């Protein structure tokens, strides 16, 4: 459970990342996948992560303290927004590569995918990148409330096939609107924190 959550800092530069031994779980996904809403649902604080009306605007890693230093959530910039210029895309790729490969605090990643849509090439590349570097990853399928019940199994199958899902990974379907499976996400955070 998350009893306390607070914003600490934002930074794109490794030299400004927090230098300690506190474990981190990173959240990443396409622009408008519902990442900020998911953070707010997890922390039960609708004002913690700002929900941007401008996709692709955030280019920083946002660090949130959880349970007074027990661990941190790290909110990564949304990717895949077409109107972001190439220089920003390159900066984003370099920052995330540096964070994922060299950040010793990182214990795992929640990769958010919209359950309504087939994963993009960016989604596939992100998942395969994390698998290549043996970074523990959980797939969080968002916007469950937007699906008909008849689509639940079909859409999950479509996503798993598209990204070449590894069966050892966890796949959770959530709704930020009605908090479906948020408790399951707490369990998976605990699992990731104990995995390395």
Swiss-Prot record:
GO terms for molecular function: GTP binding; metal ion binding. It comes from the Bacteria. Mg(2+) binds at residues 36, 58. It holds the Pfam family MMR_HSR1. Disulfide bonds: none annotated. PROSITE patterns: G_ENGB. Signal peptide: none annotated. Its cofactor is Mg(2+). One of its GO terms (biological process) is division septum assembly. Coiled coil: none annotated. GO terms for cellular component: cytosol. Gene3D superfamilies: P-loop containing nucleotide triphosphate hydrolases. The keyword GTP-binding applies. Keywords: Cell cycle, Cell division, GTP-binding, Magnesium, Metal-binding, Nucleotide-binding, Septation. Necessary for normal cell division and for the maintenance of normal septation. Belongs to the TRAFAC class TrmE-Era-EngA-EngB-Septin-like GTPase superfamily. EngB GTPase family. This is Probable GTP-binding protein EngB. It comes from Mycoplasma mycoides subsp. mycoides SC (strain CCUG 32753 / NCTC 10114 / PG1). The lineage of its organism: Bacteria, Bacillati, Mycoplasmatota, Mollicutes, Mycoplasmataceae.
